Amino acid sequence: MTGGTDRVGLRSLTGGTVSFGVDEVHGRHVVLVEISGEDRGSLRPADGENLAVAARTARDQRLPLVCFVASSGAAVDEGVGAVHGWGTAAREFVACSGVVPIIFCVTGPTVSGPALLLGLADMVVMIDDTFAFVSGPRMVSQFTGEEFSNEGLGGSTMHERTTGVAHFTCTDRDGAVDLIGELLSYLPDHTDTAPPCWPSGDPVDRPTPEAGDLIPTTTTGSYDVRDVLSCVVDDGHL
């Protein structure tokens, strides 16, 4: 990310916890959204509107949508207005799906509605020691009688290894930015253009008998599909 004069900020005078603009990530122009700041990133009506405009801008300009999020959810003191704003944003994110790449990076606690947005992303990166869930450990305990920690309920390790919500985890934000840049290098800006081409010395007609060897011979057997993919992708890079 440039973080400097090259960034084009949009709706920068509206204030609140959401800021966005057109920026660069490893040389690729993207619509970059930041959800953080005051009141633990709680979303007010204007914040929901900013999220909606950011998603609409990405779709109209055919640019990838990259969101860094840490939010406690809709601002309680704003009532139904905040919930409506979040719903408007969610609708715009749905409209982006399948049109432009959507990548989320969880940089801090992400609770309630914003946690649901992760399910609309094509890829989710979580920084270590962050968590994301709709309802917290106390409420879950009241309903189930089970005790949970933030990490056990919705931590980065849980979402990467068990729920599948997180596709990648990183130790810090810089590492996450580098990873997002790599992911973008494999993807087109939008659905109407071809993805970037990478040179490869891996022959297209290379036999992959090892992939077949991984398939169990019994109907009750199991295998890790990632091992199969590693056999067939170019240069074994997965």
Give the positions of each predicted feature:
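Terminal-region recognition feature
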Residues: 1-103, 109, 114-116, 120-131, ...
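Small cofactor-carrier domains centered on a conserved lysine used for covalent cofactor attachment
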Residues: 143
